Amino acid sequence: MKLTCVVIVAVLFLTAWTFVTADDSRYGLKNLFPKARHEMKNPEASKLNKRDECYPPGTFCGIKPGLCCSERCFPFVCLSLEF
């Protein structure tokens, strides 16, 4: 009986916490679709295509190839695609 009450209180608390911390989504889809449509018409307007910072060939990239401008990171050094 006590365990059931504890579980019910925990579920109610987590549900309330989810609603309190959630973003205001009333106009989320309304603003999302025109932006996506604009990005489909002009792919260069997409934020995903922009690179804020990338490393030139010969610099240390760790194990994340996405940091290199050429997308090639082999043994921890950015490689160039030019042959």
UniProtKB/Swiss-Prot annotation:
Tissue expression: Expressed by the venom duct.
One GO term describing the cellular component: extracellular region
Keywords from the UniProt entry: Cleavage on pair of basic residues, Disulfide bond, Hydroxylation, Ion channel impairing toxin, Knottin, Neurotoxin, Secreted, Signal, Toxin, Voltage-gated sodium channel impairing toxin
Compartment(s) where it occurs, according to its Swiss-Prot or TrEMBL record: Secreted
Location of 4-hydroxyproline modifications: P57, P65
Cystine pairs: C54-C69, C61-C73, C68-C78
Molecular-function GO terms, alphabetical: sodium channel inhibitor activity; toxin activity
Residue ranges annotated as propeptide in the record: 23-51
Signal peptide span: 1-22
Repressor recorded as keyword: no
Pfam family, one: Conotoxin
InterPro entries named among the record's database cross-references: Conotoxin, Conotoxin_d-typ_CS
Role this protein plays: Delta-conotoxins bind to site 6 of voltage-gated sodium channels (Nav) and inhibit the inactivation process.
UniProt family annotation: Belongs to the conotoxin O1 superfamily.
Domain commentary: The presence of a 'disulfide through disulfide knot' structurally defines this protein as a knottin.
Protein name: Delta-conotoxin-like Ac6.2
Organism: Conus achatinus (Little frog cone)
